[in-house]
Amino acid sequence: MRLTQLVHAIDLHAAGEPGRVIVGGILDVPGKTMFEKMKYFERNLDDLRLRMLREPRGYPAANCNVILPPTDPRAAAGFIIMEQTEYAPMSGTNTICVATTLLETGMLKMIEPVTEFMLEAPAGLVGIRAECKDGKVTKVTFKNVPSFAVHLDIKVEVPHLGTVTVDVAWGGMFYVISDAAQFGLKVTPDEGRAIQPSQNAPEERRRRGHRQARLEQSRHLDRRDRPLALRHWHRGEDGDAPCPGQLGLNEDFHHEGILGTVFTGRLVEETRVGPYQAVVPTISGTAWITGMSQYGVDPSDPFPNGFKVGDIW
């Protein structure tokens, strides 16, 4: 066996969303903040992202994280988030996967019934509250970065779909959110093949600087016709909460993924980010470890950084 660039990783999923976590084989990188370290990865180590997320080591829904020493002394660990198209400053499912990895592998001491600590994401410090029982992290609640709506009900032109009404919100990265009903679709597993073209529209999103697209469908309403639960097209959940001002402070909101798995969100304070009225949410969910792996590159491999084929990409 001839393997170079060997890394050690924990494979997990958070409510169905894959979130691989590299725990060994990567030394610290230059940068005074975790954001600067993320930019260093982007400029100098992007082959790692390609290698871990493309076939044969990854697939389109895969995510990967790298645990690094924190730059802020208040944090127990730092981490870099690598997604299919970019490096995300913040991600809900990846945060839950990283917190679960640190505790369940013993990298951080688990204290039952609750372990509290800080993580340093590229977007800033993230407070973690992990509920633990019998060596298992049963629920992770984290306090996210301030989130805000940039646009509500704007019209965009999408190839093969025409004029589409969307919202644009920031929750650690920009999300373009649209109602599945305008496409005549329901957010169910059997609609997946029809939904995917509606969710992609990459050229228009990238032209406007918006990275992720989500199709949403309201599931349950309260007496004032506000959504209490939302379903969206994603294997798991993330930090991409709804944004039209329909949720008050300290009210639970259940965000359901395509698999029926649920994260619980809550707005805990109001703030401002530049010209935008913003809120600070907490998000709760669970991750499960599925494997522990070593990945490397054979020097004779014709695809050292992986590959993409049009059948599923």
Question: For each of these PLM feature ranges, what is it?
Answer:
Residues 1-167, 176-313:
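A glycine-rich beta-to-alpha transition motif near the start of alpha/beta enzyme domains, typified by
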Residues 172:
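Glycine-rich ThDP/TPP pyrophosphate-binding loop and its adjacent helix/strand module
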